[in-house]
Amino acid sequence: METLELQGAKLRYHQVGQGPVLIFIPGANGTGDIFLPLAEQLKDHFTVVAVDRRDYGESELTEPLPDSASNPDSDYRVKRDAQDIAELAKSLSDEPVYILGSSSGSIVAMHVLKDYPEVVKKIAFHEPPINTFLPDSTYWKDKNDDIVHQILTEGLEKGMKTFGETLNIAPIDAKMMSQPADTEEGRIEQYKRTMFWLEFEIRQYTHSNITLDDFTKYSDKITLLNGTDSRGSFPQDVNFYINKETGIPIVDIPGGHLGYIQKPEGFADVLLNMWG
């Protein structure tokens, strides 16, 4: 893996291929390896960069997180993630780059576009679970609070079951999300990663400060992506709302919420039709 030294962290990332830079931002998984099957499909057309977000995978903190980062209203980590992606983009290319964020990674991508539009050539938001600008934002914020409380009081299994039901996660995705790692070490790491996401992301990222105006001023750069196998899920409803209010196009893409690993060939074909 490649390394970029930043304030407070060593950011590590996979890089394959040739051509214009395309950065993938992972969601709750946090690590770029989940995009490697997709990168193989695109490496003849793009320099594909799949990043381990700060404090996930091989990336490491060189300074501790501030105590305030676990506050449900803190925007520290999502803003820091966005700054990391912008600094990575500038280190890799003198030109604006392509960016795709998936799930909470798409929320990071929104903040990249909002705060660092100069690094963005084109950007895609794949099934973003953000609620800030929705008419029923308070309802969804309370639901995330309830999920966190249930996990902390009744255990991870029950809480994640509620999470899947609340967001209407498709069966193809629920099966993958609940699949345990192959080794005991892997299962421990999986648990730690999930609990980190619970403490620092599920509430903070989904209710971070993004408005519809943040999209409209850059609408020519944005594509919304919804999976063909995850219809009816909450993240798709978010994209439908953005589309209704702004006119930014939605493109159907193969697979579900994890379509890039479920159907990488078809996922790549859509990206090449968009940007190739």
UniProtKB/Swiss-Prot annotation:
To which species is this protein native?
A: Staphylococcus aureus (strain USA300)
Of which family is this protein a member?
Answer: Belongs to the AB hydrolase superfamily.
Query: This chain belongs to which protein, by name?
Result: Uncharacterized hydrolase SAUSA300_2518
Q: Report which superkingdom the organism of origin falls in.
A: Bacteria
> What cellular component terms from Gene Ontology apply here?
membrane
Q: Where is this region: Disordered?
A: 57-76
Which residues are listed as membrane-spanning? none
What the entry lists under SUPFAM superfamilies is as follows: alpha/beta-Hydrolases
